């Protein structure tokens, strides 16, 4: 699989999980990894505080992803968070925010705004994507990587 195909596979897995959990009432931030055998592993915190800061979430995932990178040959990883973002009028709208990385040096932040109807069905909207810096994998000139 190409790096892009690996990222797309992991995105499909985590989006399905996020959508299902949102329809059941929501989810706490979670992570996922993909190994060379196309095996996805979920990383679920055992608990989370209701009003947690983004800095604490980032620090938590740095520790968890570092452990995952050290203990297995993962190629792709991501973190998934249910967020509220301001629209053009300043009204807060719900979204699924995903930070995804590939060990080859590719990283993206992706935001999927979503709507929820009266039957709790969640519909993901067109995502906004932005290339970003790696947060969890080491830089591409480090020869110690896979």
Language model: regions and residue ranges:
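Low-complexity intrinsically disordered segments
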Residues: 71-146
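Mature extracytoplasmic domains of secretory-pathway proteins
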Residues: 49-86
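Glutamate identity and glutamate-enriched acidic tracts
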Residues: 5-8, 23, 32, 39, ...
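N-terminal domain-onset segments
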Residues: 1-64
């Amino acid at each position: 699989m190409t790096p892009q195909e690996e990222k797309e596979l992991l995105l499909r897995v985590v989006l399905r999980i996020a959508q299902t959990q949102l329809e059941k009432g929501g989810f706490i931030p979670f992570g996922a990894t993909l190994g060379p055998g196309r095996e996805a592993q979920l990383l679920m915190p055992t608990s989370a505080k209701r009003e947690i800061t983004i800095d604490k979430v980032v620090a938590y995932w740095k520790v968890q992803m570092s452990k995952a990178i050290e203990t297995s040959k993962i190629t792709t990883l991501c973190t998934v968070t249910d967020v509220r973002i301001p629209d053009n009028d300043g009204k807060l709208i719900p979204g699924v925010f995903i930070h995804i990385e590939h060990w080859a040096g590719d990283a993206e932040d992706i935001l999927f705004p979503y709507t929820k109807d009266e039957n709790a069905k969640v519909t993901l909207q067109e995502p906004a994507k932005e290339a970003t810096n790696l947060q969890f994998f080491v830089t591409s000139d480090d020869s110690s990587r896979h």
